Amino acid sequence: MAERANLVFHNKVIDGTAIKRLISRLIDHFGMAYTSHILDQVKTLGFQQATATSISLGIDDLLTIPSKGWLVQDAEQQSLILEKHHHYGNVHAVEKLRQSIEIWYATSEYLRQEMNPNFRMTDPFNPVHMMSFSGARGNASQVHQLVGMRGLMSDPQGQMIDLPIQSNLREGLSLTEYIISCYGARKGVVDTAVRTSDAGYLTRRLVEVVQHIVVRRTDCGTIRGISVSPRNKNRMMSERIFIQTLIGRVLADDIYIGSRCVAFRNQDLGIGLVNRFITFGTQSISIRTPFTCRSTSWICRLCYGRSPTHGDLVELGEAVGIIAGQSIGEPGTQLTLRTFHTGGVFTGGTAEHVRAPYNGKIKFNEDLVHPTRTRHGHPAFLCYIDLSVIIESDDIIHNVTIPPKSFLLVQNDQYVESEQVIAEIREGASTFHFKERVRKYIYSGSEGEMHWSTDVSHAPEFTYSNVHLLPKTSHLWILSGGSCGSSLIRFSIHKDQDQMNIPFLSAQIKSISSLSVNNDQVSQKFCSSDFYDKKKSGITDYSELNGIVGTSHYNFIYSTIFHENSDLLAKRRRNRFLIPFQSIQEQEKEFIRHSGISIEIPINGIFRRNSIFAFFDDPRYRRKSSGILKYGTLRADSIIQKEDMIEYRGGQKFKTKYEMKVDRFFFIPEEVHILPESSVIMVQNYSIIGVNTRITLNIRSQVGGLIRVERKKKRIELKIFSGDIHFPDKTDKISRHSGILIPPGRGKTNPKESKKLKNWIYVQRITPTKKKFFVLVRPVGTYEIANSINLATLFPQDLFREKDNIELRVFNYILYGNGKPTRGISDTSIQLVRTCLVLNWDQDTKNSSLEEVRAFFIEVSTKGLIRDFIRIGLVKSHISYIRKRNNPPDSGLISADHINPFYSISPKAFILQQSLRQNHGTVRMFLNSNKESPSLLILSSSNCFRIGLFNHVKYHNVINQSIKKNPLITIKNSSGPLGTAIQISNCYSFLPLLTYNKISAIKYLQLDKVKYSFQVINSYLIDENGRSFNLDRYSNGVLNPLKLNWYFLHQNYYHNYCEETSTIISLGQFFCENLCIAKKEPHLKSGQVLIVQKDSIVIRSAKPYLATPGAKVHGHYREILYEGDTLVTFIYEKSRSGDITQGLPKVEQVLEVRSIDSISLNLEKRIKGWNKCITRILGIPWGFLIGAELTIVQSRISLVNKIQKVYRSQGVQIHNRHIEIIVRQITSKVLVSEEGMSNVFLPGELIGLLRAERTGRALEEAICYRAILLGITRASLNTQSFISEASFQETARVLAKAALRGRIDWLKGLKENVVLGGMIPAGTGFNKGLVHCSRQHTNTLLEKRTKNLSLFEGDMKDILFYHREFFDSSISISKSSFSRI
């Protein structure tokens, strides 16, 4: 022993790691025997001190970390900010989830790192601290849950639970945290027992594969090796892993530093030599591994290396295979036990960041980066190659190199502070992660109408599907609105843009006169311009017919033809109509009947060919009761201009209307009641009741007849069929399917006596049960159709007309399809037939391109009497009337190409009055392609909010007073493409055309040119280009009525005028919450601008949802979504949870070579990089052999890395050589292919790779085969010993097959000798006769190498074995790689 003076004295705490180092140094200096004696003394000393100290563990020893409070508070603040960004639509759900995980995981990790210094400073002899860090019991993760926080939990599938547990076990858990903890932990005796059995079975399978691997030789003579380098192409290998990989190995080549050889071939590596390699910075070191051993059924000493037990080369006869199987399988039991202790705590990882070394300005080449979004939704730049970033300070310039595929988080010329994060390094593509593709479903949080921008693919993914794909990042919007009950949809007479009251249990048509604003106002004129140029803006015609009055998209004019047709004065001169119409004041004085002609004018005044100009509902064709329409023998033709039309991207959908060709149809009446699902029905199905019978508690029947009750989704439909019931004989033939109409004279009401019928009847077969049926004879109403409008009377011939281009045609339409039910609400009548006037004009050669006419409202003043007319004339160009809405290019907001398409078109409109509740709203109508009935969305004042744009308290009253001086200013410039104005704060908003007085109206309204006059606050000037100049320095906003845009002005006090500004608020624009439109102005909520007015804007509330490329949108544009409906599906790739319970299944998955659930998204890029190296070896001799070797070697390295990654993530240290022995066995077989039939092996036969090479060399014949990857189970059933195979699985099949083939078992392995009771052929003391003598002269083997081998020897070493991780993905080797000898 060394002298006492030379001993080193250490005065510090020795933990488990220090003990390991101490033992290692003792073994190196004193050997095994003396080291064991020293350690025995250390053990005795430890027990004595522990007894004297009398350490006990109590609850008071669990000390919470002081910094936990502010760390948790900071994490909550970050989560709150993240929640706000998600609410504003800046990040989507997946980005929010990822960032939330990292926030809480980082907080938990900080607490865990603070735990050890806290104990060390406050109480170094704390029992919990000494227990956890001595390695005796518990670890840092478990103690962290006691004194830190439990953090995020995993569910049984390994997915993260979004709610973190902030408490620790010392503080106690709340009820919610306890339930999450129980759900996440899901531990118990059964789970632990199952995991333990899995670990034991894994160990058994591993031992089955390698039980015959015994050290039989000293040197196999191989010249191959695997290169290990601390600096790989893709990433740096940590020094600790580098040392663990090299220690105990044997060099395959000499190591030179400069010209001096520092290590020789076949020299084993110790810690001293490895440290010297690290110090001198050796680039690559070639080592021998079990992969490179040339022995087939055993292994040599030099390829195995040092024995971990003795620290010397492994001895001959050592059963290293069983040691390897036990070394891998036994930690699986530890994983199971550790699972129970940790309890499902989620573990993850954080990205590596690059920070600025000091303050300075960032400089980099912007051409080498591309803008993108990080996985957290933050804006960043992506660099594809190494990017040099220069940080310029006052006195120094620092250069930072950002590796490829990293995110740059700062902009060019941005000033950064010291330690600020400037880049985020993405993990290299070669690093293996268990990734999986996950679907994240986003559900609608509210009820409303779905909108999206032009970024969404409007064509569905599949035919007849409602799934749309996103080509790039965009917003989805749920516009607020309440839907009416589904039971009332079919019977509703409301159309798009109708004003109504909610609920609408009883509906009656009301005059438009209720919408007048003030009785003392001038006659209201309806005129506006279309704000879109379809040809210029690139937007298809979504806003052709846009509403301007509070009733609909159309202007409804009730003409004066209600009593006599001659009251309508019609003049046709110069290819135009002049039709007078009434003003609202005139309508208020006299009662308007509902049976008059309703003239429909689009808002832009443009009629296309065959479009409906007016319609007339004849009261003779109205019914108050519900029923079914029949006209089976009629011929129905669809016309060009359909009545209910919805235009959207991708096509047009029409609700068909039928043109009558025969003047008779039939109506079969029935009484229908739609009841809620919870209603109490007091009658039975198929029963007969009389008139005024109580059906429910508050409903009585209007007619008598047969009761039919049908229960549907969330409602009950009760029908009463009036008529007679007959029970026919078997001889009567009654249609089984639908009813039949029987004309008069053919009736047979009684089989014994025949009787002629006077009227039509409807015979219907009703089957209450399978065997019984009866016939219901129902009365039928017959309708004859006659011409109700005489065009000659309406529009008399005009002697002064020049050409008769424009004409009106009369069409009669049946509003319901054949066999379709008609439904009425309460006392509302049902219109069966509608007479429509359709505009048409002749096409000549000069005007062949004219496809539209324009209608204008004009006013003619004669002797103080004002008459209003409609002028209809052919127009050649509508560019002068249609203005393109455009935002200035510097506005930074949505351009005209991104404006959403606006609402659909419905010609009919009614105003509904409800006396029950005064909740006013507007109907939005949608047609669902899958449903016959339309659905309604009611937009009420609760879904919108008004924001005043002038909120300066100092000048607010002045503005209000100036508005009150002129009552015309209160008439708001409204609406535009978005349709009806909403009643908010009892203020109606329409009438875009204003006149100053009755006498001067003709000056502003000319016949040939419509001159638009508008009213703005006097201090604003708007020129013809829309540029705004403000002479009042106290206001900062101005409305441009022609474009319906708000301009916010920045004042210039030096010149006393305002500069030209960009558009901030436009009609129809979507914007997210927290948008600050100007200084001292309110922050707007998210929504869509519905109305733009002089002093305020009305915004429809909307909820934005951000979606990234590849997401799938469920539902069509403008479809009604209910709360909880699936809105978007995100498909993203995430790393599988690092939960410790998943460790054992991952190892088993890799060893059994099972295919993973989904392939990594970047697998294609990896294969491309892999193929680049393959091209270097094509076209040279022995290329097939190299291809097979390449496949096998790279798959071996990949498998070793995967298994090591799993165990290292759990803190389990396993030497690579153990895993290499296992992987060598499952990759040592090749599959003989059918090409190039061989006389030796059968196609599909599994043979060893070395055997195939030697056989081909001996026969001088090329044997075609391909590499195959076997699992440990298949490898156990494909060995040289059938006794070993039969003792594992499938005993009968294996023995029968071996007997038929005449297989011979040479009993070389351990297991077959155990089965037969022989001596185990292993052990260092075994008979030396079985141990093969090693070859002392390797030069003999070198001389036997052929010249061909020398051709590619260097390439083999460089190409195949230089990179440690070449192809890191979970692959099944099925690629055909033929080897030719």
Swiss-Prot record:
SUPFAM superfamilies: beta and beta-prime subunits of DNA dependent RNA-polymerase. It is found in: Plastid, Chloroplast. The gene is rpoC2. Belongs to the RNA polymerase beta' chain family. RpoC2 subfamily. GO terms for molecular function: DNA binding; DNA-directed RNA polymerase activity; zinc ion binding. Its EC number is 2.7.7.6. It is an enzyme of class 2 (transferase). It comes from Draba nemorosa. One of its GO terms (cellular component) is mitochondrion. This is DNA-directed RNA polymerase subunit beta''. DNA-dependent RNA polymerase catalyzes the transcription of DNA into RNA using the four ribonucleoside triphosphates as substrates. Zn(2+) binds at residues 220, 293, 300, 303. Keywords: Chloroplast, DNA-directed RNA polymerase, Metal-binding, Nucleotidyltransferase, Plastid, Transcription, Transferase, Zinc. InterPro entries: DNA-dir_RpoC2_beta_pp, RNA_pol_beta''_euk, RNA_pol_Rpb1_3_sf, RNA_pol_Rpb1_4, RNA_pol_Rpb1_5, Rpb1_funnel_sf. In plastids the minimal PEP RNA polymerase catalytic core is composed of four subunits: alpha, beta, beta', and beta''. When a (nuclear-encoded) sigma factor is associated with the core the holoenzyme is formed, which can initiate transcription. Its cofactor is Zn(2+). Binds 1 Zn(2+) ion per subunit. PANTHER family: DNA-DIRECTED RNA POLYMERASE SUBUNIT BETA (PTHR34995:SF1). GO terms for biological process: DNA-templated transcription. It catalyses: RNA(n) + a ribonucleoside 5'-triphosphate = RNA(n+1) + diphosphate.
